[in-house]
Amino acid sequence: MPIKEVLHDDRAVFVCPECQKEFTAEYREPEGAFAAYRRDAYERQICPDCTAKHEADKRTAEAEQRKLMLLATLDDRMARAGFPEKFRKMDKPFVRDTAVWMWQNRQHSLLASGATGTGKTSSAAFVIREIMKQSRPRVMYRTWQMLQAEFVKAKTTDNDNEFYFFERLDELDYLVIDELVGKRGEATRLSPSGQDLLFNLVDGVYSEARKTRVWILGNFYDGAIDRLIDDPLPTRRRLQESFKLAWFERGKPVDENISIYEEIETE
C-alpha cells in the first residue's frame, strides 16, 4: 500500500509505486464527497526522484519534437530568407576554414572578404542553416544590388516606406549582404542612395542602435571601400571597430589581421 504510515503535522510516509522507495509528503485524511478521489490520488503519488525523471523525460521528448519541427521546415525557412537555391541545403561547407571562422564569430557582425571561390556565400549559408537547426532566427539574405533596389524603391514611395524599410531590417537577427564588391577592380562609386544605405547599416551596428548581426560579403581588396564612398573614413572606422574582419584566400590560413582604418587617419 503506497501510504505506509500517517505522521503528525499533516504528513505521511508513502511507498513510491514505481521505484518502491519510501518518501514523506503532505497528507490530509480524505473526507467528504471527494474522499475516494483524493485517496486514489494519494495511492498514485510518486516520489520526488521519479517525478524529476518524468519531468526530464518530458523535456527531452519536447526538445526532440521541436528539433524535428525545425528540421522539417529548414529548407522552407532558408528559401524564405532569400538564399539562392544552390545554397539552401548546405550540410557540408565548400571551404572549411571559411565556414569555421564564420561559425566561431556567428554572434558578431562580419566583414568577410576574399576573391570568388573562397567560400564566403556558401559558408554563410551553411552557418545560418546550422543555426536554423537549433532555433528560428529571423534572417534575410540579399545581394547588394537587390537590397539597394529595395531601399531606393522605399525612398521614392510615399507613406514612410523608408522608415519601415529600416524597421524591417532592425527586426532581423541576421542580415547577410552579398556581392558588395565583386572581382578586383570592379568596385565602383555607389550612388548617393547606396552610400546612405551602407553607412546606415554600418553605423547602426557601430552605435548599437541596430541589434541585427550584419554580415557583409565581398572582395574588399586594398582601396575597395575608398572607391565605393565619397567620404570613406567614417565607414572604414566603424567597420574596423564594430565588425569582425577576415580575409580568405584558398590554401592559406584565415587572415584576421587586416586593417581598413588606421588611427592616424581623421574623419
What are these regions (language model features)?
Residues 1-97, 257-267:
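A short, basic N-terminal segment
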Residues 132-171, 188:
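Short glycine-rich substrate-engagement loop in P-loop NTPases that contacts/grips substrate
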Residues 122-136:
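P-loop NTPase Walker A phosphate-binding motif
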Residues 137-138, 171-175, 208-216:
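Loop/turn-to-beta-strand initiation segments
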Residues 107-125:
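Walker A/P-loop nucleotide-binding motif
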Residues 97-103:
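N-terminal flanking helix/linker immediately upstream of nucleotide/cofactor-binding cores
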